[in-house]
Amino acid sequence: KENINFFDFIKIDIQGAELDVFRGGAESLKNVLTIITEVEFVQLYNDQPLFGDMSSFLSKFHIMFHKFLSLQGRTLKPTILNNDLNHSSQHMWSDAMYIRDVEKISSLNNHQILKLSVLGYLYGSPDLTFHCLKFYDKKNNTQLTSILKN
């Protein structure tokens, strides 16, 4: 057994069983900063939890939905446009980015604030990065936000 106290970042895609993993590893969610997980909007597998189920569960750990990274879908059967089954008029799944609730940022230590800022930057969320750095600057009397203004 490994002695890992907490994770900063989780990326998971296991064909509809993501919520089962989070339920089984709920203790690991108490300190996670960012989660990238596949979510579905329509059931692709039997008894599969959907986006709302995932968001509701994660919110219990002060983890909020931030954005979709890649909406994916299929054409509605039996309509097939231009012989293309992948014509995605019906959004069916996406990778979703969840983050530590920004309203609770004061509960994070300095390292966590900076890590969340970097994760926001890496996943194309400059507003999240700026928010974290602005809070960090105020807390530590620094000027890290100035690097984003140039």
Model-found features: residue ranges?
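Conserved acidic-Pro-Pro-aromatic motif
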Residues: N5-C132, Y136-D137
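Short amphipathic alpha-helix with an adjacent loop that forms part of the alpha/beta core around
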Residues: K1-N3
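Boundary/linker segments of alpha-helical solenoid repeat arrays
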Residues: N140-K149
